[in-house]
Design a protein with these regions (language model features):
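Cys/His-clustered metal-coordination modules, chiefly Zn-binding fingers
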Residues: 179-271
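Domain-scale terminal segments
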Residues: 1-196
């Protein structure tokens, strides 16, 4: 069992998942983050590991490692997720669902790539100058200067920039338990559709992530964007794959995780 803390964003309110169990703290770059985080941790003394999900930027990594040092407990574990707002919100909710299913925190940390692959994120933006990605090239900047043009981005196992419109095969992968988590300008939603064909998942439950994206995340830098994350709300298959997968290694040092980790001696956190 573990608890999930979202640093700088809300959890996606998927009705069938325990999103209400996710605690929301300020973004790590905000001046009051350390005080708010320490107040929460000290007011809820527990032996249960806490996973602090953040946007994976250098600032967030530094502040969360500082928090872990000040608090002095190895059970406070930062989890960097290099995804935009819908991906962060969805990941926090999925982690809370896996905790409810009894998945061990060590297995969750070592199986994080599989968890990120559980959701599919697509986005369009009219501007790429705010994107902190090595994949952004000169041609993407030139395209974003054309009136009415958008740059498409897809988040799978890797980040793809300038991808074509979604094909029918992608929509065919959406199952009956899927939900859509979205953010940004809904007027751009049609730009994610297949050529000449609207996206076929209009009947799926749709959840809006309220509030702005973290300003230091290095994503859109503009209001003229739209992002959509599609995930399956039934996590039982995912939990089974994580529990039996070959990727059980400590994210801190790469040691194989069995009952403990020699790097951080986190026996309670990794069983």
């Amino acid at each position: 069992m573990f608890r999930v803390i979202a640093c700088g964003f809300p959890a996606a309110a998927v009705p069938s998942l325990p999103y209400g169990a996710v605690v929301e703290l300020p973004h790590p770059s905000e001046p009051g983050f350390l005080d708010a985080a320490l107040d929460h941790l000290l007011s809820e003394e527990s032996d249960v590991p806490r996973l602090l999900v953040h946007d994976g930027t250098r600032v967030s990594e530094h502040r969360l490692r500082l928090l872990r040092s000040v608090y002095g407990d190895f059970r406070v574990l930062p989890v960097g997720v290099r995804r935009p707002l819908t991906g962060l919100a969805s990941t926090a909710t999925v982690l809370a669902g896996l905790a409810e299913l009894g998945v061990a925190p060590g297995a969750v940390l070592s199986g994080l790539p599989l968890i990120l692959g559980h959701s599919r994120i697509e986005a369009v933006s009219r501007r790429v100058s705010g994107l902190d990605l090595p994949e952004i090239g000169l041609r993407h900047h030139l395209v974003s200067m054309i009136p009415g043009a958008v740059v498409r981005i897809r988040f799978t196992e890797r980040i793809e920039v300038g991808v074509p419109r979604s094909g029918h095969h992608a929509d065919a992968l959406i199952g009956p338990d899927a939900v859509v988590v979205r953010a940004g300008n809904p007027a751009l939603a049609g730009r994610l559709a297949s050529r000449g064909q609207p996206v076929s998942n209009g009947q799926l439950p749709t959840i809006d992530v309220e509030g702005p994206a973290p300003v230091t995340s290095g994503w859109w830098g503009t209001r003229n964007y739209y992002e959509r994350c599609v995930l399956t709300s039934d996590l039982r298959v995912l939990a089974s794959r994580i529990g039996t997968g070959p990727w059980r290694r400590c994210p801190e040092c790469g040691e194989p995780v069995t009952s403990h980790c020699r790097f951080c001696s986190a026996q309670e956190a990794f069983v």
